[in-house]
């Protein structure tokens, strides 16, 4: 799914969210384990450059969490690449909990360290 924040037809922020996790996610000590599409993964979240600092990423995350509750999703998982401290702060502020740091290979960046975060929906 593509979640989008628009203003007057202009996309200000967007996120790709679905239940398709990377194989490395299986070895993470999540509180909520993946089964039968009960967990969503935020794969990418982006805010238009000139719109940064306006709280749009926070609003988009809140929208994703709200929709996940309506869809009976039990948790949201994601990873943050090493040195992206702004993303770490964003997700922690939104209520995500740090789980672990893992080596993950993505074609775009190669083998890197990623911090794993989880939001358990209650």
Question: Which residues make up each language-model segment?
Answer:
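Conserved acyl-donor/pantetheine-binding loop and adjacent beta-alpha core of acyl/acetyltransferases
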Residues: 15-44, 52, 107-108
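Conserved beta-hairpin
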Residues: 1-15
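Conserved GNAT acetyl-CoA-binding A-motif
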Residues: 61, 68-79
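Conserved acetyl-CoA-binding loop-helix of GNAT-fold acetyltransferases
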Residues: 47, 53-66, 89-93
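C-terminal "cap" of GNAT-fold acetyltransferases
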Residues: 36, 81-85, 93-94, 104-122
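Hydrophobic adenine-recognition pocket in adenosine-nucleotide-binding enzymes
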Residues: 45-47, 80
